[in-house]
Amino acid sequence: MAASNALLLISGALLISLAVLCQGDPVVDSDGDAVQLNLGGRYPLYTIESAAIGFHGGLSTLHKDVCKSYVYEAPETDRGLPVSFSASATSEPVMQLGSRYKFSFLMPVPRICDTAWSVGKSTEETGVYKLAACSCEFCKIACPEVGSFNVNGKTLLGIGGEHFTVRFHKSDALAMKTAPQ
């Protein structure tokens, strides 16, 4: 499949899932703490960064229009956009492996569209996760693995591509209002 056909266009309806090894265990951030969900009120923000060895930036978006953007790996000096997480099917306060969540990239300008993702474990290394794309929130079919593609000097995420794993890092701020549900 050509890289241009495999690029992952992120929209409000796209779900991302992480390959599941230990379904139900909590997802942990780079400090070893469980990743907290937005259940309303104040909630923590995170950045998502490549787990590869070397210098890498965090995940961010390249805007195509109001509700469509490509997810890419920002330059190494950029930790990426802050992200909040919410779940439609659970009231658990922490993210669990194998469950699906909305990941809301916090943009410098208001957006009315969210990106929904899901979580699972990549390796036995604590806090390292692999992404896979799902077409709907409650589908029972397997989700294809997400990898990286180098396009015009930028590392974009897409279906297939090079192996790509991530870590969650706490952001320096707490969100003060509820993210879009």
UniProtKB/Swiss-Prot annotation:
The record marks R100, Y101 as: Reactive bond. Its main location: secreted. One of its GO terms (molecular function) is serine-type endopeptidase inhibitor activity. Keywords: Disulfide bond, Protease inhibitor, Secreted, Serine protease inhibitor, Signal. The record marks K68, S69 as: Reactive bond for trypsin. Disulfide bonds join C67-C113, C134-C143, C136-C139. It is found in: Secreted. GO terms for cellular component: extracellular region. Gene3D superfamilies: 2.80.10.50. SMART domains: STI. InterPro entries: Kunitz_inhibitor_STI-like_sf, Prot_inh_API-A/B, Prot_inh_Kunz-lg. Residues 1-24 form the signal peptide. Belongs to the protease inhibitor I3 (leguminous Kunitz-type inhibitor) family. Possesses two reactive sites. Inhibits two molecules of trypsin simultaneously. Inhibits efficiently kallikrein, but chymotrypsin weakly. This is Proteinase inhibitor B.
